[in-house]
Amino acid sequence: MPTSPTESIPNSSTKEQPILPKMLPTAKSPHTTPAQSPQNSDHHHHHQQTPPQPTDGQQCSNCGTTKTPLWRRAPDGTLICNACGLYYRSNNTHRPVNLKRPPNTIAVVKEEEGSCKGDGRCNGTGGSAACKGCPAYNNRIVAKKALEKSPKNDSSRAPIDKSLKRSTSTDATTEDESSLAIACFNCGTTITPLWRRDDAGNTICNACGLFYRLHGSHRPIKMKRPTIKRRKRNVSDKKSKDEVQMHSSDQSPIVASDPISPTPHNNENNNNVTNITTTTKTPTRSPHYYQPPPQYPYQHHPINSTTSSAINRLPPISYQSPYQTAPLSHSPMQSSSSYSPGASSVIPSSYYPPYSGSGRIPNGPGPVPGPPPPPPPTQSQPHHQQITTSPTSQSYGSLRAPIHITKRGYTPENIRLPSIQLTSSTSSNSETKLPPITNHSEKCCSNCAGPKSLAPMAIDFTASYRFNNIDSQTKLTKEDQNDSEGVSRDNDTRDENKPIKQEEHRSALSIGKLLNG
């Protein structure tokens, strides 16, 4: 057959192609690239398994792959992939390539729309809106595409004709997509968010890989589950929540329930208010968003006992004080008489308790100046101002809308000032009369001498005097006598050399004696 030699020639050329890169570096040794030299020296036994180096891309010098998320450099400068680089950094040796085995494939039925319901349990077949972000579904598609583009499938096809090669490749890819899928070596599942490998290089699923890394043994098949439960990706729940929110927003706002009214008159008013809320179209101005508290006619209608528990909010505070809140008036006559201008006056209400009279305000800064107020009198009150306390009036004491505090029917006494006793002018003069001022010549009594009157004299404050003892006598010169002018004027005529007696020396006044008298 003439076609046999032509067919044998390309077959022989294809078999010799992996050998050509080995011969080229020997012939062109000075022009060898650093990526080819370590392959010849260190990894010569891997050349039969690795495909030839592409002319337009990069290739790992260890495993021969052309795709990696990060290219690295080995210590000898060669280009390696990310997996080989991480393995070398942790183990200080190159990653073994012979342990990498092709994944297992099993036949599956092709499903156009998929059977995954999207309720958080993924079976890897698609069919839901949430499958776009599902790692199990996406990894399954990527694994199928990588499997159909593997070099094993390319080498098995014979390059007889280019047209035939294209047709067979397209048919094979469609068959692979419909009938083949990667399966776990341990449990046989085809659904996993991440494919792993054990120490033997077998492809296992994420669950088996985590169990193997934790326990050091393969996961029992009884623990296998048909579906994978994902986290917080329930599209159905989100849709249901959105529908509920849209449904609630479309509905009209609910009118607040009518408060309990004590009288039929208030019921009619409340009915009018509800009618207004239903007829208005603008919800921002409708009164049902803010409804004022109902105004009860306390002065004309009694309050039922059944409504006290519903409206009463705070318990009444009662203090023992001369001022007391006005009771609920049950008739117009009493209300008009209690608010007469001559009988009572309005006092503003306060949240603080009254002054107790102990000199300090409760919760106040300190004592109050002035005496405490007088205690309330116990006199009888007129008939029209008597307060009749009943259980119903005490229970509804906190339901008053305008709280008017009135006094009792008494007039408070004036503030008592401390009494000051003032004596007459005659008695005060007799008791507190000072002795009259007398002249120097008069004597206070018969035994005492008259007051001493010293003539004005000049004192030299620079001179100092000392008193000598009785035994020692000092002689003063004329200059000393002139300096000390405290001597009597009668002794002016003295001899210059005559000594001065002690008595005469003592008669001289010093500053201390002058000041002390």
Curated annotation (Swiss-Prot):
This entry carries the following GO cellular component terms, namely: cytoplasm; nucleus
- Segments of skewed composition (Basic and acidic residues): 147-164, 234-245, 476-507
Q: Bias regions of kind Pro residues — which residues? A: 364-379
Q: Which SUPFAM superfamilies match?
A: Glucocorticoid receptor-like (DNA-binding domain)
What GO MF annotations does this protein's record show? DNA-binding transcription factor activity; DNA-binding transcription factor activity, RNA polymerase II-specific; RNA polymerase II cis-regulatory region sequence-specific DNA binding; transcription cis-regulatory region binding; zinc ion binding
Region of interest (Disordered), ranges:
1-61, 147-172, 222-435, 472-517
Name one process (GO BP) from the record.
Answer: negative regulation of transcription by RNA polymerase II
> Where do the ZnF regions (GATA-type) fall?
60-84, 184-208
Q: Which intervals carry biased composition (Polar residues)? A: 1-16, 380-397
Biased composition annotated in UniProt, kind: Basic residues: 222-233
Q: Where is the composition biased (Low complexity)?
A: 263-289, 327-358, 423-432
Where found in the cell?
Answer: Cytoplasm; Nucleus
Signal sequence span is none
Taxonomically, which superkingdom?
Eukaryota
Keyword annotations for this protein, in alphabetical order, are:
Cytoplasm, Iron, Metal-binding, Nucleus, Repeat, Repressor, Transcription, Transcription regulation, Zinc, Zinc-finger
Functional description taken from the UniProt entry: Transcriptional regulator of iron-responsive genes. Represses expression of SEF1 and genes for iron uptake if iron is present. Plays also a transcription-independent role in the direct inhibition of SEF1 function through protein complex formation and translocation to the cytoplasm, where SEF1 is destabilized. Promotes gastrointestinal commensalism in mice.
* PANTHER family per record: BOX A-BINDING FACTOR-RELATED, TRANSCRIPTION FACTOR GATA FAMILY MEMBER
Protein name, UniProt field? Suppressor of ferric uptake 1
Native organism is Candida albicans (strain SC5314 / ATCC MYA-2876)
Task: Name the gene behind this protein.
Answer: SFU1
